[in-house]
Amino acid sequence: MTMIRKEVDFGGRRLQLETGRMARQADGAVLVSSGDTVVLVTAVGRREMKPGQDFFPLTVNYQEKAYAAGKIPGGFFKREGRPTEKETLTSRLIDRPIRPLFPKGFMNEVQVIATVVSVDRDNDPDILALVGASAALAVSGIPFNGPIGAARVAYIDGKYVLNPSYAQLTTSQLDLVVAGTRQAVLMVESEAQQLSEEIMLEAVMFGHAQFQPVIETIEALAREAGKPRWEWVAPVADEALGVQVREKATPLLQEAYALTEKQARSKRLEDVQQAMAVEFGSDDAGRGDMVRGLLKKIETGIVRGRILDGAPRIDGRDSKTVRPITIEAGVLPRTHGSALFTRGETQALVVATLGTKGDEQIIDALQGESRDRFMLHYNFPPFSTGETGMVGSPKRREIGHGRLAKRAIAAVLPTDSEFPYSLRVVSEVLESNGSSSMATVCGASLALMDAGVPLKAPVAGVAMGLIKEGARFAVLTDILGDEDHLGDMDFKVAGTEQGVTALQMDIKIDGITREIMAQALQQALAGRLHILGLMNGVLSRGRGELSDYAPRIITIQINPDRIRDVIGPGGKVIRALTEETGATIDIQDNGTVTIASVDGEAGAAAKRRIELLTADVQVDTIYDGKVAKIMDFGAFVTILPGRDGLLHISQISNERVSDVHDHLKEGQAVRVKVLEVDRQGKIKLSMKDIPQ
């Protein structure tokens, strides 16, 4: 196999695609590089579909190797383990834009693996992995209606920046990833600092325009190195069976979709499916699959047709109405902050917990170790949809929804100096019928304010949908689960009254114009403002006081040279401090001391003791001390915690002293004056002329 390499200028950097040198037994393998960041992406597909397969089994795995950054993994086994959150999120980021581009009816297993093999400090490998997945599929011969391009867009000083460096992102008001084909945007993932809808939309269009040269480069690579496309044809439909099922099932399904309550509707749909399976199914698994597929098409036609004809939606609403909302704050007695947010048949119980710096999450990434003071975890138990299932580690969807909600809230959090707490928010989805991630955003904002966190502004979120047939289309506000599955777009927008803080978009079809996206954003703004109005009626700002069960944090600054005095030999001093006061104490290398305690008096006591431990001894100042040890030549007196001075025998009294024991005893309280502190820090004391 001949090695073929293509290059393109992409945001001022050279993007290189190479195939034919590595992983040659994969159907498609492309090495993507920019700077010193290199990602190997492979695509492999099974030629035969598994019997009875009724869904498309696409698997995407993004993995970062420690050696890529010149590191050895930690832990006992010293090798990479379960996927990190970054790896899981990037796997989803790749999956979302490529999945809609496989032909309908294609049920063969496909696996895409992106492996980061080298990484620098300027180029994030996620965009390279996305581009590489597109290129690997394009050269593989697997049926795929690509390629796609992808780009990251920042907004700095009023200008859009293509593929910013890590350093540039720290000053950017926007971090947006957009992916799509030559004609259409397919996926957007972003977080923003309360930017307007117009700025967000222009960022999407800017990114789409800028990655066109990447698509052209992938097409050129595929023309030279691509394998012949598989001779795959879509399963042939049984027209006679289709007519029979349609005649029988259509009126029954129309009756089912006239039911506005989810559980009743689901039960009726299940009954229809069972009846059709009995009447038209057989022992032939293929025929049963065909019947299920036909029913799905009929359902899709009913729901979409009603909406485009202007009829009420599944639950009786028009296209712009938000479902009924009920809001409760402070619903749990012992938590630091809590809220119960219910929107229609979607409900989230959200709890906020305040912690100390020691509770921050330590993230060991390829780019280096960092700490995260804000964590948001989203849980989606099976009972939320009336089902049974496994309960355990979070799935990819839960991690993705949690990150979206976190992005939405992060823009309004106070700085560490304004509110020196670590924050953990947990969303328990108790009921779900669409838009549970946006219910989490609303609940998280309320729970944090209930906990006393001074947010810059409340945040709300709403999920939008789209039904489009030819020139006719309808944008839907606050979509249901069925509208998500049967629609053409899932468009989630979160933000404040001032602007957008997070936007996530997944589009399943071509032809979504700028005008349609603009309408969706404006309709989402109206929905968001409506929800914020209801939220503000319950809680519009952080409560003035923290929960009685939340830690009180005191922050003081000490001389870094005195840190050792607070810690003591082997941690003896700080251990005694925490045990005796009950406070948690954290000391940074720069001398910042954080004292946390649920009991305010305990925190104040710990503060006083640390101030004494780190206080500088002042010459000519009188101290209340305690005799620590008596010697023949005098006594050592403790004047501050950990600070002893020498009281020489000649300084005990104005009269001559022959035996120190005649005047002092160990443990005796005495008042002494500091005469001198020499260069070595040794302290000389005197009791002369000091009233005892």
From Swiss-Prot:
InterPro entries the record matches: ExoRNase_PH_dom1, ExoRNase_PH_dom2, ExoRNase_PH_dom2_sf, KH_dom, KH_dom_type_1, KH_dom_type_1_sf, NA-bd_OB-fold, PNPase
Entry binding sites for Mg(2+): D484, D490
EC number: 2.7.7.8
Keywords from the UniProt entry: Cytoplasm, Magnesium, Metal-binding, Nucleotidyltransferase, RNA-binding, Transferase
Residues in the signal sequence: none
Stretches assigned to the KH domain: 551-610
Localisation: Cytoplasm
GO cellular component assignments: cytosol
Gene Ontology molecular-function annotations: 3'-5'-RNA exonuclease activity; magnesium ion binding; polyribonucleotide nucleotidyltransferase activity; RNA binding
Spans traversing the lipid bilayer: none
UniProt GO BP: mRNA catabolic process; RNA processing
Family classification: Belongs to the polyribonucleotide nucleotidyltransferase family.
NCBIfam families (UniProt xref): polynuc_phos, PRK11824.1
Protein name: Polyribonucleotide nucleotidyltransferase
